């Protein structure tokens, strides 16, 4: 199931840097993280769903690239984001 409009707006409101911000790296990573967690739960239940697994891997790669970009450009924002999302230990 795709992310609902209400849930997406809730995530955007939490991570937006300014009013109407939907494209900042923080927002994109937060939305991808929610989708990845959702797909991860699906994969645990449906182990043979290879198409969904491939989509999950693509989302993980996209998030990894966005995080690498943020880390290169602004380390403090990167650290705040991974701490707030609970990524990496």
Swiss-Prot record:
Family per similarity comment: Belongs to the universal ribosomal protein uS15 family.
Protein name (database record): Small ribosomal subunit protein uS15
Alphabetized CDD domains for the sequence: Ribosomal_S15p_S13e
Domain of life where this protein originates: Bacteria
A Pfam family per the record: Ribosomal_S15
GO cellular component entries: cytosolic small ribosomal subunit
GO biological process terms, semicolon-separated: translation
Protein's organism: Streptococcus equi subsp. zooepidemicus (strain MGCS10565)
GO terms assigned for molecular function: rRNA binding; structural constituent of ribosome
Function field: One of the primary rRNA binding proteins, it binds directly to 16S rRNA where it helps nucleate assembly of the platform of the 30S subunit by binding and bridging several RNA helices of the 16S rRNA. Forms an intersubunit bridge (bridge B4) with the 23S rRNA of the 50S subunit in the ribosome.
InterPro entries according to UniProt: Ribosomal_uS15, Ribosomal_uS15_bac-type, uS15_NS1_RNA-bd_sf
Ranges annotated as spanning the membrane: none
Subunit structure: Part of the 30S ribosomal subunit. Forms a bridge to the 50S subunit in the 70S ribosome, contacting the 23S rRNA.
Keywords, in A-Z order: Ribonucleoprotein, Ribosomal protein, RNA-binding, rRNA-binding
């Amino acid at each position: 199931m795709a992310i609902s409009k209400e849930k997406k707006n809730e995530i955007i409101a939490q991570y937006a840097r300014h009013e109407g911000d939907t494209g900042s790296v923080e927002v994109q990573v937060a939305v991808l993280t929610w989708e990845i967690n959702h797909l991860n739960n699906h994969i645990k239940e449906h182990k043979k769903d290879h198409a969904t697994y491939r989509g999950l891997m693509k989302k993980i790669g996209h998030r990894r690239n966005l995080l690498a970009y943020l880390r290169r450009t602004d380390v403090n924002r990167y650290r705040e984001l991974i701490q707030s999302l609970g990524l990496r230990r």
